[in-house]
Amino acid sequence: RMSDPFWAYLERLPGKSAALFDWDKALSGWDRYPLFRDHFLQLTKNHATAVDCPTECGLGCPRSVVTHVKTNIRAICNEKEYPAVQLTTRQTLIYRLKQSAINGAICAALGIEHREAKLDGLPHTWRLGDFIPTAGMDFPVVLTMQDSKDALAEVVRSLCLSIPKPFVLIAPTRLHLSPAVETLLAQRSSPFIALNEELHLGDAPWFLTRRDKAAIFAPLIGQVPEPDSGG
């Protein structure tokens, strides 16, 4: 099964919010999109002043949203290369990721004890809770959604300084995982989980794992002492 496309979109989306027109453009080809939209996106009070350009001209510049009257809203090509695109009012509404719902669904799928907290000073980064392979052993689980290698490296360096034991780092994809960050995590015996590789959205609004949880968390389960080993 192909990986769900929304993970990669979330990773590159500034502020984890966009006009409905943009969510639709990015994800409407995905069969689970209506389910994802209804359960994991939240309407805000804001309207877009620009939307992503629907043409493949290669420039990649946004289109300005111009409202003449309420029934005449258009996305204008500022380069005047293409005709304007007619928009509905609903398409200009800004929807943001319902982060608490996504975080809870990730924890439920991966068997993480959900005790959520925002991490101060680290943008788009949450302590989701703990992975507890056996009583008395717990590993902090952190979700981060960064849009560059430098940003991810900054987050990981900070986590390595503030968390005194192995932890689990979760990100939407491994796109921004540099060799330097992999080394940092390996030195801390801290596994990295790419959500697009491990989870997919099922028929109901929750995630399913692509493989057994014991395989996903094998590096940590390997740190659990054997019974009667004195560890």
Regions inferred by a protein language model and the residue ranges of each:
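Ordered hydrophobic segments in well-structured contexts
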Residues: 74-76, 127-131, 138-143, 166-170
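Proline-rich intrinsically disordered, low-complexity coils
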Residues: 34, 54, 62, 83, ...
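Helix-turn-helix DNA-binding segment
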Residues: 229-231
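Short acidic, S/G/P-rich loop/turn micro-motifs used as interaction or catalytic elements
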Residues: 113, 132-152, 161, 173-179
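Generic recognition of flexible, low-complexity loop/linker segments
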Residues: 129, 156-157
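Extended, compositionally biased accessory segments flanking or bridging domains
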Residues: 1-134
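Charged, structured surface patches that assemble and position nucleic-acid processing machinery
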Residues: 159-225
